[in-house]
């Protein structure tokens, strides 16, 4: 569950390392976001000479959460950190690689481009 002010790790090679959630998109009173949801983030920490700069405001898609994801077969999956992938205004990922695992729930939400960039899908 991601809410406003949550600090997140960036799981791609766009240049940002840490971002902070500004808004969870999808309704005026929506408080929490989970895997596959779109949020607005501010870049807090980044690498030099990359595509994004500190202070940039970008959209991102949540790919990993600490909160368990319950599946229909009775299994659960959770990760050790909260992570996002930065996207542009058209919904295309800014980075060219995704580091770490992502969940197969992203494929159900029609985020196939992110799943194809990921090294492993759980």
UniProtKB/Swiss-Prot annotation:
Q: Which InterPro entries match?
A: Ribosomal_uL14, Ribosomal_uL14_bac-type, Ribosomal_uL14_CS, Ribosomal_uL14_sf
PROSITE patterns given in the database record: RIBOSOMAL_L14
- Key word Ribosomal protein present in the record? yes
Q: Which GO terms describe its biological process?
A: translation
Query: According to its record, what are the GO cellular component terms?
Result: mitochondrial large ribosomal subunit
Question: Pfam families this protein is in?
Answer: Ribosomal_L14
User: Does Mitochondrion count among this protein's keywords?
Assistant: yes
Record localization? Mitochondrion
Q: Which SUPFAM superfamilies match?
A: Ribosomal protein L14
* SMART domains hit by this protein: Ribosomal_L14 (SM01374)
Top-rank taxon of the source lineage equals Eukaryota
Keywords in alphabetical order: Mitochondrion, Ribonucleoprotein, Ribosomal protein
Which molecular function GO terms apply here?
Answer: large ribosomal subunit rRNA binding; structural constituent of ribosome
NCBIfam families per UniProt = rplN_bact
What family does this belong to? Belongs to the universal ribosomal protein uL14 family.
* UniProt protein name: Large ribosomal subunit protein uL14m
